[in-house]
Amino acid sequence: MAFNSTPPVSPGGEAQQRPPRFPGEDTTPTSQKEIWGWYAYGIAAEVFAVCGVGSFLPLTLEQLAREHGTLLSSHLPCVRFSSPSTAPGNGTTTATFRRDGTDNDQCVVSVLGLQVNTASFAMYTFSLAVLVQALTLISFSALADYENNRKTLLLAFGFIGSMTSMLFIFIAPPVYILASLLVVVGVTCLGSSFVVLNSFLPVLVANDPSIQTAHKEQGEELSPVNSNGEFVRFEDLDEEISRDSDDHFTTGHRPKTKAAGSASPELQLSTRISSKGVGLGYCAAVLVQILSILMLFALSKTSLPKISGTLPLRFVLLLVGIWWFSFTMVSRRWLRDRPGPPLASSKGAARNSRWRIWLRLIGFAWKSLWKTAKVAVKLREVIIFLIAWFLLSDAMATVSGTAILFARTELKMSTTAVGLLSITATLSGMAGAFLWPVVSRRLRLKSNHTIMLCIALFEVIPLYGMLAYIPLFKKWGVVGLQQPWEIFPLGIVHGLVSGGLSSYCRSFFGLLIPPGSEAAFYALYAATDKGSSFIGPAIVGMLIDATGQVRSGFFFIAVLILLPIPLIWMVNAEKGRQDGLAMADILEKSHREHASEYGGPSEEAEGLLARDI
């Protein structure tokens, strides 16, 4: 039965609130202050993503391990003191641990009884971090929609993540393994918090006064929103709310009244807020990156680097953590709680302990993902694209981590130079997001052809690095990433391509999915992204251990980047769209036929899953 409530009116009598979907829902009109609270968290966390994960965390991990490591050939310390005295503070000098690129000069540390290259240690850490992040994202995605969990989880992830960054100031080389643990926790909190942050957006949009005004001008009654944050008519309200809480497989009706190609006011506002949030986050990241470079330059003039080569880097991570924590506090003050429905009815709460309800929701999240995957398998174009995205997202993640470590260990670039490289890639990525639509329009490229062009340019990066294996170029000492300056043009290529791939792949996937199931399929898209990104770094880490060179990873990366091209070429967007529309009809019809069976302890919509398109 629907929950009926008379829509309240604001004190000024101008902005009318929509009726709540459930008792206790906060339908207060969204204010600019609240939107800025949403922006504030993007400003907070994007700094850790770019300056921490994308720049200084890999360097810190490798340097901490190196200062505790030994040379594989002689078992001498990789870092030795410059004076006979072994007391800290007398100055240190990094030993030459790779003179001719042979295994005998590797700097290694012992991890779980295994001798691991210090660069591999960083790659393995990020591989584990991404895997844990993927498992956490899937498990906790459903919890954010209930009670006050949305804001509680956002703040918890933000505060814990920022603390992990700040705690690096206390991590010395003898306890370098703790740095790996902090990275896993920090990366997990970062990714999880962005998912929770995105869950605020439909709620903010649905309660925005401009949306309410737009619907009023169109002669529509203000109505509650469905699970997608979309307005539903009062005549559909009973059906929408009476659905069992477990039925999130189909999340609304297929839109039939809106003309093709027209964008709803909700979609326009959501896109505008989202794009501005991304832009502000990147601007904040560039600002803090510049501050970090200035800090590194200033600290290089002090005695801190003589005590430990990681101290300046740890001070940068302290700055990043303080920034993340500070702007999370702004979000805490400006974002409203916007609670979701209760986890259980009063009777259910009496019968079940709270932890059992949370476990049930975690199981529900995995069950929902599995249901969506079984439907996706029936959509040929969707499954081909997801396989391509699985490979492509892994390649993008692997290139980023490998490039930072290559610049540091092979090219011997300073931390300041690596910071400048990160800024170059970030600014290029921002430019790429705007440039590729222009290129695609000028060349009249289809979306999948634009993606293929981006991938082809991406392939330039590992191929150029492999040129150093050609004797002629190796003799020259230039070409093939043998000089530090060569990596900056490739950083521009990486940024431009990454910006185009991120935007085009997401929008192209949106053309293929069944209307009305966007939330479920984008959850599968995100799981595919995060679920694959731990494989590449782990394999590159093994190659580094086997060869003693980061450069050897370019062979694997070159193959990994090429694999998605034929798959993207095979995707027929028009057929995929038609299949998606057909599946939407099947899902809607099946939901009506099996609505009475949903929510049972063991029943599933086997009818729709057994059908062929």
Curated annotation (Swiss-Prot):
| Matching InterPro entries | Atg22, Atg22-like, ATG22/LtaA_families, MFS_trans_sf
Q: Reply yes or no: does the keyword Cell membrane apply.
A: no
Q: Which UniProt keywords apply?
A: Amino-acid transport, Autophagy, Glycoprotein, Membrane, Transmembrane, Transmembrane helix, Transport, Vacuole
Localization terms from the record: Vacuole membrane
Region described as Disordered: spans on this chain:
1-30, 592-613
Q: What is its main location?
A: membrane
Membrane-topology annotation of the record: Multi-pass membrane protein
Concerning CDD domains, the annotation shows: MFS_Atg22_like (cd17483)
The residues that the database entry marks as glycosylated are 90, 448
Gene Ontology cellular-component terms for this entry are:
vacuolar membrane
Kindly indicate whether the keyword Disulfide bond belongs to this entry.
no
GO aspect biological process, one term? autophagy
Q: Which Pfam families match?
A: ATG22
Record field: transmembrane: 41-61, 120-140, 167-187, 189-209, 278-298, 307-327, 382-402, 418-438, 453-473, 477-497, 508-528, 553-573
Biological role? Vacuolar effluxer which mediate the efflux of amino acids resulting from autophagic degradation. The release of autophagic amino acids allows the maintenance of protein synthesis and viability during nitrogen starvation.
Recorded family membership: Belongs to the ATG22 family.
Question: What is this protein's record name?
Answer: Autophagy-related protein 22-2
Species of the source: Aspergillus fumigatus (strain ATCC MYA-4609 / CBS 101355 / FGSC A1100 / Af293) (Neosartorya fumigata)
